[in-house]
Amino acid sequence: MSFGLTNTPAYFMNMMNKVFMEFLDKFIMVFIDDILVYSKNEDEHKEHLRLVLEKLREHQLYAKFSKCEFWLKEVGFLGHVIFGEGIAVDPTKVVSVTKWVAPTSVEEIRSFLGLAGYHRRFIENFSKIAKPMTKLLKKDAKFKWTEECEASFQELKKRLVIAPVLILPDQRKEYHVYCDASRRGLGAVIMQEGRVVSYASRQLKPHELNYATRHLELAAAVHALKTWRHFLIRNHYEVYKD
């Protein structure tokens, strides 16, 4: 099937997920034709590579050797850099964000927030910081780039530059989820052994503006549990709130 056809990526992604179903989230990640194999040590990695290559051969799928990289200690994948210590924002993506000039239209705001938002899990309270700009995305909002918008814009760029390295979660260890809520939005962080796995945040929905504080705190906890359910299901965790 030609990659020029509209449905080809979705079809191929579905096929690859079926081929590697038994290995997904155990030692392999797949995005269309990119296959990432990860392991704890070299012996384990050797076995994982054998299983993956045998599975490809079994389904008559062949990898081009010149486009393969093996035994890497650090790898760029979907805008991130993954290595032994954790996961970081790809520096090349950070450079493109820092060079962004102040938006002059709603479309440019949407483009910037789309790019910055892809890395929102690295930024504490992303939604609160972005709020002055997201207000301009409302249907009847008049575009006016204020000092508050400029401060929001510059703060997000700065946060991406200094974004922390997030640890890779260990499903054998306990999770700790910390939640925060205010009239400015909901925020949460999930951690293991005092180190950040991911941040999450969102702005309040119109009806939530009338919530009592205790209900906002509950909404923050619900948002966190939904966001990270793939980490928390079948695992022990504790939730903390102010």
List each model region and its residues:
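Retroelement reverse transcriptase polymerase core
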Residues: M1-V239
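Short loop/turn segments at strand-loop or loop-helix junctions that form parts
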Residues: D242
